[in-house]
């Protein structure tokens, strides 16, 4: 019976300390090794893409210093409304050091396509967004 009480006490203490161990505030992230950012290289601002076209999406990023990089991932999302909403994930889950993805342009005409290059690590770094609104491009009608 004493073992059961000791185990219960240990679990209560562990759960009480858990939020402190997973502090993901901007200040804590900066102190632990920086924040995430990305800059789109291609497609470029104003570039006209056509449905079915193969395009290399390429970016340069600054990754935070994360303890367990194997638990991290990247994704690229597409907005068709100038970056107000990102409803289409256009990549599979990518390794964190990936800097490009070969993409087949969908038949989704818009004059305001924007990409968001995302990064995150389960339990170690929150999903972080880097929408590329300064690099709006066009998906032409088929």
Where on the chain are the PLM-derived regions?
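Signal peptide processing junction and immediate N-terminal pro/mature segment
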Residues: 21-31
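Bacterial N-terminal signal peptides that target proteins for export
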Residues: 2-11
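Extended, solvent-exposed regions of the mature portions of secreted/cell-surface glycoproteins
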Residues: 29-142
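Bacterial N-terminal signal peptides
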Residues: 11-20
């Amino acid at each position: 019976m004493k073992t059961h009480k000791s185990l219960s006490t240990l679990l209560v203490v562990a759960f009480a300390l858990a939020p402190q161990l997973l502090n993901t505030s901007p200040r804590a992230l900066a102190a632990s090794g920086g924040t995430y950012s990305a800059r789109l290289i291609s497609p470029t601002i104003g570039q006209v893409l056509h449905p079915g076209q193969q395009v290399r999406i390429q970016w340069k990023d600054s990754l935070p210093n994360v303890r367990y990089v194997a638990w991290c991932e990247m994704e690229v999302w597409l907005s068709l409304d100038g970056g107000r909403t990102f409803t289409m994930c256009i990549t599979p889950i990518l390794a964190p050091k990936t800097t490009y993805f070969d993409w087949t342009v969908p038949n989704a005409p818009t004059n305001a396509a924007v990409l968001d290059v995302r990064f995150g690590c389960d339990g170690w770094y929150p999903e972080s967004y880097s929408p590329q609104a300064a690099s709006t491009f066009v998906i032409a009608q088929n």
